[in-house]
Structures are given as structure tokens and as C-alpha cells.
């Protein structure tokens, strides 16, 4: 069952990677051809966009990672295996999308703000966090196994 769920979640995981690559290529082409005007980073609009992207990263990355851990603690104690795996799959997909959201916004605003490096760093931090959401059968077993006292989980 863990292998099947990991396979299903890999569609979300690699789908977000493809979406990030498409966003990168699309924004590069749109900005380089002048279809989308580059926003000055020191303008009011540029600063507001920067604040929104940074705030989004500061909220969604910890919420996606730690929030999922808290949900797993509740799911772990369920008796019904089918419901347990169903809820795990749903919340793991939400975690992948939440963490990837900051990466996508960082990539889009990097080009939109004229290759502003701070947005590239936001996207890089989100990409590192996104790596920790990679679903594997072993990881699913560990996260859903009953918690033992003084036991290392990873």
C-alpha cells in the first residue's frame, strides 16, 4: 500500500517540478520579449510583491512541513488502515503543493522583478524544503508507524 501511495504522490511531486520549469521558461520568454513589463524593485509595487512572496514563503514552508508532522501524529493512531492511508495521501499532496507554492512564486517574481536575486534565494530555499517532501514507501512507513518512546524516526 505504501508503494502505491508513494507512486501516486510522485505525480504531485514531479508535477510541481515540471510546473516550476514551465514557469521559469514562460517568464523568461515573456520578460525577454517585452510582453510583461519588468517591475522596478524599488517601486512601491516591487516592494509589495517582494513582501508578499517572502511572507508566503515564511508561512507556507513551515506550515507545510510542521503542520503535516502534526497531522501525521493524529493519523498514526487511527485503526482503520484504508482511512489512514487515504488521509495520509490527501495531506501529503497538500504539503507538496504548499511548499512548492513558494518555489513557484519565487521563480515568477525573480523574472518579473528583473532578475532580482532575493527572489531567486526565496525560490532556492523553497526548493530545498520541497526536497524534504519527496514521497517514498519507506518514508510513509516511518511516518505512519506507531510512535515508540525514545525511538528515532529518521
Q: What are the residue ranges of the model-derived segments?
A:
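Cytosolic-side membrane-entry/anchor segment at the start of a transmembrane helix
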Residues: 1-22, 77-83, 142, 152
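Alpha-helical transmembrane segments of multi-pass membrane proteins
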Residues: 21-32, 65
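Membrane-interface helix termini and inter-helical loops of multi-pass transporters
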Residues: 32-43
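Alpha-helical transmembrane segments
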Residues: 44-61
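Membrane-helix interface/capping segments
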Residues: 62-84
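Short membrane-interface loop/juxtamembrane segments of multi-pass integral membrane proteins
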Residues: 76-98
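Alpha-helical transmembrane segments and their membrane-interface junctions
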Residues: 100-119
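Alpha-helical transmembrane segments and their immediate juxtamembrane interface regions
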Residues: 122-154
